[in-house]
Curated annotation (Swiss-Prot):
EC number: 7.6.2.7
Gene Ontology terms for molecular function: ABC-type taurine transporter transporter activity; ATP binding; ATP hydrolysis activity
Class in the EC hierarchy, top level: translocase
Residue ranges of domain ABC transporter in the record: 4-234
Gene Ontology CC annotation, any one: plasma membrane
Annotated protein name in UniProt: Taurine import ATP-binding protein TauB
Domain of life per record: Bacteria
Alphabetically ordered keywords of this record: ATP-binding, Cell inner membrane, Cell membrane, Membrane, Nucleotide-binding, Plasmid, Translocase, Transport
Recorded family membership: Belongs to the ABC transporter superfamily. Taurine importer (TC 3.A.1.17.1) family.
Reaction equations catalysed: taurine(out) + ATP + H2O = taurine(in) + ADP + phosphate + H(+)
PROSITE patterns in UniProt: ABC_TRANSPORTER_1, ABC_TRANSPORTER_2, TAUB
Length: 262
C-alpha cells in the first residue's frame, strides 16, 4: 500500500518569498487502487507526484510504499510524464528495455521482457521502429511499457494524455484500464479533466488551488465497470456519471472563487 500522510511542501522562491505548494495531503492507495488527483493548473498535483516518485523531498509529513519510507527514486515506482522522454537514437524495444539494462539484466532476458510489454500495449510490430516514426499516442504507449519494465509496485502518471487529441485520449484511457486490470498495479494519476478522472479512478481526490489540499474525495466504480463490460459510452452517458461530473465541477469552481476573493 502507498500511504501519504500529511504531506506538505514549501519552495523557496525569488526575493526571499516562500511558496506553499502542498498542505497536509493524506490518502492511501491499496492494492489494485487507481487514485486520481484532479485540480486546476498550479494546485500542486505534479508536486505531489514528484514527492511520491522521490524526486522532491517533503517539507513535512511522510510517504511510505509497502511500509518503506519514500525518500529517493526507486525501481518500485514507474513514472510516465505528459511529454515522453524516449531516447530518439534507440529503437522502441531498446527504449522499453532501458531500465532493465541499468538493472544489469542480460540482453536476451530484457529483450524478451520488453517485447512482452510491447504486446501488452499493442506495439510489438513496432519493436524495431524509432520514436520519430510513431504518433503521439504510440509514443505514450511505449512510455507506459517502459515504466512497467522493472515491474514497479505503482505507476505514477503525470497527465500522460494531456497533449493528445480527444479520440486518441479516449483510446489511451481504455488501454490504460486494460493494462491496470491485467497487471493489478496500483496507479496514481493526475489530470485536470473531470471526465478523465471519473472514468479512470477508483478514488478521485479533488484538490484546491495553491496551497494544494484535498477538498473532496469520491470513491467510484466506473473503471471497474468498464474493465468488466468494455462499454465506455454507456458509462459516460449514465445519469450517475453526469451528476458526479457536475458536482465536481461545482466544487472546483467554488475553490477558484474562494481564491479570487482572498
Amino acid at each position: 500500500m502507498l500511504k501519504v500522510d500529511h504531506a506538505s511542501v514549501f519552495f523557496a522562491a525569488r526575493y526571499g518569498r516562500t511558496v506553499h505548494a502542498l498542505d497536509r495531503v493524506s490518502f492511501d492507495i491499496p492494492e489494485r487502487g487507481f487514485v486520481v488527483a484532479l485540480g486546476a493548473s498550479g494546485c500542486g498535483k505534479s508536486t505531489l507526484l514528484n514527492a511520491i516518485a522521490g524526486f522532491l523531498p517533503l517539507s513535512d509529513g511522510r510517504i511510505t510504499l509497502d511500509g518503506r519510507a519514500v525518500e529517493q527514486p526507486g525501481a518500485d515506482r514507474g513514472v510516465v510524464f505528459q511529454k515522453d522522454s524516449l531516447l530518439p537514437w534507440k529503437s522502441v524495444i531498446d527504449n522499453v528495455a532501458l531500465g532493465l539494462k541499468f538493472a544489469g539484466v542480460k540482453r536476451r532476458e530484457r529483450q524478451a521482457r520488453a517485447l512482452e510489454l510491447l504486446r501488452l500495449v499493442g506495439l510489438d510490430e513496432f519493436a524495431g521502429a524509432f520514436p520519430y516514426e510513431l504518433s503521439g499516442g504510440m509514443r505514450q504507449r511505449v512510455g507506459i511499457a517502459r515504466a512497467l519494465a522493472t515491474n514497479p509496485d505503482i505507476l505514477l502518471m503525470d497527465e500522460p494524455f494531456g497533449a493528445l487529441d480527444s479520440l486518441t485520449r479516449e483510446q489511451m484511457q481504455e488501454l490504460l484500464v486494460s493494462i491496470w486490470d491485467k497487471t493489478a498495479k496500483k496507479v496514481f494519476f493526475i489530470t485536470h479533466s473531470i471526465e478523465e478522472a471519473l472514468f479512470l479512478g477508483t478514488q478521485v481526490l479533488v484538490m484546491s488551488p495553491r496551497p494544494g489540499r484535498v477538498v473532496a474525495r469520491f470513491d467510484l466504480d466506473f473503471v471497474r465497470r468498464f474493465a468488466e463490460t468494455g462499454d465506455a459510452r454507456s458509462i459516460k452517458a449514465s445519469p450517475q456519471f453526469a451528476e458526479l461530473r457536475e458536482e465536481i465541477r461545482a466544487i472546483l469552481h467554488s475553490t477558484e472563487d474562494l481564491r479570487s476573493a482572498a
